[in-house]
């Protein structure tokens, strides 16, 4: 049976030491260090203190602030801790970022993607007519080839849950609670936590919830907001 590596034993926890060695060798005037919000509380806060100490020890002043990608024109609610460092006595400081909310919705970034059958994939966009947001951000270009557009295999039971999840959101911006499903659609034994395990992407909003690295475990968390596409997947 596959056993996951405990977070405390993950070798990536010490990558900041390698980062500090690069800083010490190349001595850039400034650097940016990004990490997830959880770094502040990892190991009771000890890891966060060690990271800051390592960066300061190689000759840098540092400052850290929480930043959110949605405040920089990105259609995703993604909070991160951003450390900016500069050489001591350089007179530099943490930048004052101009924040901009995108004049677009998440649907604008999904509009040119073709519908897929369960387990299917496509390497072609559905149309050459794409949104101004895709054009202005450079996400979509005339010569672009569509990549990584594939759908997970879905059971009929999951598709029915998707339909209910989408209707709840589109009709009243409400989230589906797993315990509100009829018994014939419930397969998970855990009925006390992760009750929002089925979640639709907020297509009509200026940003959606955070995309996760472990999407294989949370694949029901990013349901396409178009109800017609949900029906097509049958």
Q: Regions from the language model: what does each represent?
A:
Residues 11-86:
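Conserved Class I SAM-dependent methyltransferase catalytic core
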Residues 5, 79-80, 206-209:
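Short, surface-exposed beta-edge/turn micro-motifs
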Residues 135-234:
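C-terminal target-recognition/interaction regions appended to catalytic cores
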Residues 17, 45-49, 104, 108, ...:
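A structural signal for well-ordered alpha-helical segments within the folded catalytic domains
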Residues 67, 110, 211-212:
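Bulky hydrophobic/aromatic "packing anchor" residues in well-ordered structure
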Residues 1, 39-42, 73-76, 91-93, ...:
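Short catalytic/ligand-binding loop motif for oxyanion handling, primarily in non-cytosolic enzymes
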Residues 73-128:
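Flexible, glycine-/basic-rich loop-and-beta segments that form/coincide
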Residues 2-10, 227-228:
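Short glycine-enriched, charge-decorated loop/helix-capping segments at active-site entrances
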